[in-house]
Amino acid sequence: MTLARHVIDRCNLTILLEPGHEDLAEFLSRHEVEIIASLPCYSARNVNEQRGDGVFDASIRALQLLNRLGYGSDGRLPLHLVYNPNGTFLPGPQAELEADYKAELQQHFGIVFNRLYTITNMPIARFEGHLRHHGQYDAYMDLLLRSFNPANVNGLMCRNTLNIGWRGEVYDCDFNQMLDLQWRDGGPRYLWDIDPAQVEGRAILTGDHCFGCTAGCGSSCGGALAAP
């Protein structure tokens, strides 16, 4: 029996191999849950530098497990990967990166997947701390501002998607949740406080980080927003 809703799991690949979670991949496949998983590069060195030693090998084994269950080849089990740059630059063209990923992962590991989504590094949280520590914050923000692309604005995920926290908090996007920019009308707003009829036309809470989604080809949970 499958779930009655289209469910997407923003999956940490390595958790699929952790003790106590051995049945998670099979559970997701049985319920036809779409998987979107981060793999910052198809190179072991780059992934391990960004995520820690051993993460690349564990991610590859997890992807091979998902492939054995039908993910990436069975139309009912979509498997998408997410790329974000390992540095202070914008993602390259999504279609070209997807072709490279598919060729490299198939050739070296026999892995197949459906789509690759490119996401810009947002100047918040740990990445903001890294930028400030190395004196690169102002230069990176200047890059985002200079790369503003008005063609991305209509497709911004904050204009058609809500983010709901685990306690019911309502945010305009994932990044606003990380910054605790919760909806407020005299106080915090929760999912059960919201009248759907009042959502359309509501002002979106914005900040400097929003230029990350409008730069270059754009960025969203579904990848690039505009053609290169």
Please name every model-derived segment.
Residues 1-20, 27-63, 80:
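Core AdoMet radical
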Residues 20-24, 197-199:
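A generic local structural motif
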Residues 26-27, 154, 202:
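Short secondary-structure boundary/capping segments
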Residues 43-157:
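Radical SAM enzyme [4Fe-4S]-AdoMet core and its adjacent flexible, acidic
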Residues 145-176:
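C-terminal accessory regions of radical SAM enzymes
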Residues 169-228:
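Flexible mid-to-C-terminal extensions adjoining Fe-S/redox cofactors in radical SAM and related proteins
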